[in-house]
């Protein structure tokens, strides 16, 4: 069993924002597999998919970004999912729009959702997919990440969401290191 967490903020107001690209990836997986979202007792929405015989629990924390770990850790404990079977998907300002980067460990890199998860799981060594949203040319980062993708960026971000979902489906049957090597070269 795997736990795939897409990070974002709950509510219509944030639905299509850069900061919610993690939600968009797990929504894509739920859509592909035609599985419903259900409210979890761990302050999140969950959906279960089966890929190649492997159950994957998709989660969208409802805690708001900065408290994502408060949802992830209890789900890991409840389902007895080891850290190596967890993937966190989130937005990254340091990658160009549409680029994805898979890693098995690393710091939070200034991302508050990742800081919360690292604090709650007590390690930086877990799988993650960073989805590029780029940096603003000027202005405050907070307004930028809480803004929607402009029309010109939509084809690139849609491709990145689909590629991220493909990588997660591959992870059902393939060690993350191999998935990482495959998708980081594209």
Curated annotation (Swiss-Prot):
Domain of life: Bacteria
Enzyme class: hydrolase
InterPro entries referenced in this protein's UniProt entry, alphabetically: Pept_tRNA_hydro, Pept_tRNA_hydro_CS, Pept_tRNA_hydro_sf
Pfam family, one: Pept_tRNA_hydro
Site feature Discriminates between blocked and unblocked aminoacyl-tRNA, where: 9
CDD domains noted in UniProt: PTH
Site entry: Stabilizes the basic form of H active site to accept a proton: 91
Catalytic activity: an N-acyl-L-alpha-aminoacyl-tRNA + H2O = an N-acyl-L-amino acid + a tRNA + H(+)
Sorted UniProt keywords: Cytoplasm, Hydrolase, RNA-binding, tRNA-binding
Keyword presence, Manganese: no
PROSITE patterns xrefs: PEPT_TRNA_HYDROL_1, PEPT_TRNA_HYDROL_2
UniProt-listed GO biological process terms: protein quality control for misfolded or incompletely synthesized proteins; rescue of stalled ribosome
Family: Belongs to the PTH family.
Assembly, per entry: Monomer.
Protein name: Peptidyl-tRNA hydrolase
Origin species: Listeria monocytogenes serotype 4b (strain CLIP80459)
